[in-house]
Amino acid sequence: MERLCSDGFAFPHYYIKPYHLKRIHRAVLRGNLEKLKYLLLTYYDANKRDRKERTALHLACATGQPEMVHLLVSRRCELNLCDREDRTPLIKAVQLRQEACATLLLQNGADPNITDVFGRTALHYAVYNEDTSMIEKLLSHGTNIEECSKNEYQPLLLAVSRRKVKMVEFLLKKKANVNAIDYLGRSALILAVTLGEKDIVILLLQHNIDVFSRDVYGKLAEDYASEAENRVIFDLIYEYKRKRYEDLPINSNPVSPQKQRAEKATSDDKDSVSNIATEIKEGPISGTVSSQKQPAEKATSDEKDSVSNIATEIKEGQQSGTVSPQKQSAQKVIFKKKVSLLNIATRIMGGGKSGTVSSQKQPASKTASDKTDSALNTATEIKDGLQCGTVSSQKQQALKATTDEEGSVSNIATEIKDGEKSGTVSSQKKPALKATSDEKDSFSNITREKKDGEISRTVSSQKPPALKATSVKEDSVLNIAREKKDGEKSRTVSFEQPPGLKATRDEKDSLLNIARGKKDGEKTRRVSSHKQPSLKATSDKEDSVPNMATETKDEQISGTVSCQKQPALKATSDKKDSVSNIPTEIKDGQQSGTVSSQKQPAWKATSVKKDSVSNIATEIKDGQIRGTVSSQRRPALKTTGDEKDSVSNIAREIKDGEKSGTVSPQKQSAQKVIFKKKVSLLNIATRITGGGKSGTEYPENLRTLKATIENKDSVLNTATKMKEVQTSTPAEQDLEMASEGEQKRLEEYENNQPQVKNQIHSRDDLDDIIQSSQTVSEDGDSLCCNCKNVILLIDQHEMKCKDCVHLLKIKNTFCLWKRLIKLKDNHCEQLRVKIRKLKNKASVLQKRISEKEEIKSQLKHEILELEKELCSLRFAIQQEKKKRRNVEELHQKVREKLRITEEQYRIEADVTKPIKPALKSAEVELKTGGNNSNQVSETDEKEDLLHENRLMQDEIARLRLEKDTIKNQNLEKKYLKDFEIVKRKHEDLQKALKRNGETLAKTIACYSGQLAALTDENTTLRSKLEKQRESRQRLETEMQSYRCRLNAARCDHDQSHSSKRDQELAFQGTVDKCRHLQENLNSHVLILSLQLSKAESKSRVLKTELHYTGEALKEKALVFEHVQSELKQKQSQMKDIEKMYKSGYNTMEKCIEKQERFCQLKKQNMLLQQQLDDARNKADNQEKAILNIQARCDARVQNLQAECRKHRLLLEEDNKMLVNELNHSKEKECQYEKEKAEREVAVRQLQQKRDDVLNKGSATKALLDASSRHCTYLENGMQDSRKKLDQMRSQFQEIQDQLTATIRCTKEMEGDTQKLEVEHVMMRKIIKKQDDQIERLEKILQHSSLMLQVFES
């Protein structure tokens, strides 16, 4: 059971039982080469299989026997046979790491690219085992490094999913595909991001992996990183993208990552409009122009329209060419919706040499409106001179949407006018529109050929667009109009467009209009147009009526124009409208012209069917030359009904010229009401004749005109109905004008041809009906038209149809109608077969999913069991550790005891040295037999002691070795743990450093501007402070000068006092002079005092100013602090805004996920409807699954029984070992007892000796003490041995407990098998219920089919 539930990598070994094998297999398993040689010599089949479909080579490779493999290979054994798991011997050898066997097989030509049941090759298992040498050998022998099944990983993806970094690096070096994807569209980068493997992500980015690849759910690796909140990986991918954009060339003008991230914001709608118009005018020498545009847009809005129009006109150099006003008006009509356009026009004039111009633009715009339009208009006009010119334009557009509606319209209109020599024009357009839901591709290729006499010209136009959408609306229109001829030679233009597109929903509409023809000179040409639409759908019905016929004849030269078109449009939504109208009318004076107008509007009713009408009626005759119409025109010019219920194309026509365009929703609703009878009608009612000569019409043409005249009443009725239903819109007026104009033309033609009416016969009408039925049989919706034609003919001819000829013809028409019904039934049967196949595939996938779920549940159960086993193993390890600790403690005790004994022996030796002479004298005296006995006893004791010492030394050496090994193991474990801890710490520190560096860079970037502003303010303040300091220094210098003066004045004053004394002593008579001098001095002192007061006042003023400046500085510091607080508040506000932004972004993502879930629910509903028919298959499959489950259960029970037996055998062996150990311990105990008895005898002898030698000295007392100590040591050893015996007994009891536990597990497994049987019974009941439901559904389907038959009859 475990083997069946494995993932292919677990349980690689074969589960072998003897009754599975045959003789050759047994010989291989036993390794008996001689028997194998004998069997091979007796012509025994070397490729014989056992009951498990294994060959001898399989077993030899699985068991790793290269000699056996060499022998089998030399006997030409088949190397590529598979076992039950579809595994070859090579796969088995690689899986089990048998490199020698694998190399032998590879050297002898084994195929390494064969896959097993799981879709894996030998390379997958080598990658899983991380066997690099084996991988190199496989690759050298031609292994495909990308080989795998659809549902399996490639080797590189397997290495990534298993987190094998070394193997990823090795495979990348071996040039594995980095951009490989799995069945869910996930690349290696997406897998690595989901697993959170940073190293693998770095490796993949180093090897330039595609970062923009999306999986089935439309998600990028960056999206998964953001969902997982793995900041490191997200930053790595973001930096890689930024570097890629920086490394792009200058002309490419890449979109910056900020813009890309802004495009993913929470805006409801986005508009991306880019219009490029390039006009290149060339001279006599050719020029090359290439324009590329790659816009990338993403929107989460309600509607999104993408319009791309390319109009290229190549005009002659010397001849004049003009564009008709009708064409200009048709090009203007496409842009009736709300479109914002960005026009970029580059014009490059080429002189005498060729030039190359490349323009690339990648706009990304974002708006918050409800409806968005994305228009891409490119118009290139190239004028050629005398020589040939080559123009190539490429356009690549990638638009992504998860919205409700998408429209994609591409209009191509090219006109070619050639001069004297040939020219080649190639235009390519490659738009790619992507949606996050299910998407498909569509391609259309256009080729044209022109032949001119001896000179051949080729015009190739390719258009491979890939349109992908799962939204509600999708418009795809291709309009191509191109025909011009010159000279007197006939030319051929072939126009092909074979696109293949698929539709999986309700309806498809494809409208293609091709019309343009011109005549020159006195020549006419023949125009034959064919249209072959190929539409594929799994919807209810698809109708398409291709009818085009325009022919004109001339006298001298005839030309043919063939136009083939195979459009296929894919839709997965409710409504689709695709309208394109390019009418052209070219009228010349004396020359004849051909006008071809085609209109195929497609209106969709809420019912299942739809109608597709194409009307082409153009025939203009020349004035001077009489033209004829061949009889091949009959099937194209016909009518399909005269009743009032059938509606002509007048109710569906859209005005040509400036009034042509898309249809309004009001008109659509009105037309849905009118066209309830699901009629497809083809009317050709435009015939204009002119000129100077008389022309005659053959009856073939007149019959068709008669039929169209009879349809006049129905046409007028439909026009009046349209008036009543619709409101007054411009589309209504267009329909009324069209119906009135057609009515007038038909009445004029009827008045001019009265005789032709009377010549119409029933035979001709019946021929027309037969031919019309043949043409309409190409499409599936022409049956009701044939029925109505027959009824109308019977109503017209009334009683004239009673003759046998007419009745036979009517019967023939009915037979043809029945044949058509049979053809349609066959087509329906084919579709049913396809649907059944798809349902079978879906049931198989569901089986696989259920099996995988069962495997997952079993794996979880196994994981729990393994965890239990791990717990038990951990407990056993802990017990072993405890045992080792006990052993170490015993070892230490033994060593201590040995040390003590050695010390005692040394003491005894020291004591015995002085006693030796006394002993010698005693020995001389004691020459009796007692002396001999004493000598014998001493020699025996010495031998015993030596033997014990040797045993103890051996045990000590053994214990030391064990201790050293245990210590080394513990140290290694500690070092490994420490190394891992250091590694983790180092990684965490590196991560923290990176994060801190990133945060620092961000904070530096944020605060750099603020710091700059603050530094500016600080510089201004510092300049002011410096000025104030300078002024203060000046004041201080002045104060110092004043102080110097005061000091000088004081000195003068002192000197004056001294002089005064001297003068008083010297000159007593000069008192008057002294007084005078005193007065002078007083006056000077007053002056100086005044100056001092002034200086003090100035110093006070300066102090006040300093105080004021200090206060101003304090105020500025407060202002600075206030500014800092405001900055902090702003930062907090910014953080809050960022949080709000993140929350809004999360809500937007949730809305997108809800929309995706809604789409998925729709798809699931469709799948559930389809699964009703598969119920029977499921029932059968469930029965098979139940049988398989029973087989698996039996195998599981058998495996468990075998495992239990093995476990029992192992336990029995363990018990035997324990018993042997117990016996061994008992023997040791007996030996110890014997030794104890001998020692007791020796002690008694020593006691006797002690009594004899008490008089000789006190040395014997020390010997007795040593012997007593030795005895105590032996007793301790006995106790330790008893403890060991107790431990062994406890282990034996634990083993018995384990046996009982295994027995309980077997009983539980038996209970599980009973539960599975009960579930089997329940499943059978459920299958019976489902069978009843299937029978009810079949009855309902039969009833519905009968009702449908009744309605059809």
Curated annotation (Swiss-Prot):
Keywords: ANK repeat, Coiled coil, Repeat. Residues 731-762, 821-908, 937-1055, 1119-1344 form a coiled coil. This is Ankyrin repeat domain-containing protein 36B. Belongs to the ANKRD36 family. The gene is ANKRD36B. It comes from Homo sapiens (Human). Residues 250-259, 355-367, 389-400, 579-600 have a biased composition (Polar residues). The keyword Acetylation does not apply. Pfam families: Ank_2 (PF12796), CCDC144C (PF14915). Gene3D superfamilies: Ankyrin repeat-containing domain. GO terms for molecular function: identical protein binding. The lineage of its organism: Eukaryota, Metazoa, Chordata, Craniata, Vertebrata. Residues 260-272, 295-306, 436-455, 471-491 have a biased composition (Basic and acidic residues). ANK repeats lie at residues 19-48, 52-81, 85-114, 118-147, 151-180, 184-213. Residues 249-307, 349-607 are annotated as: Disordered.
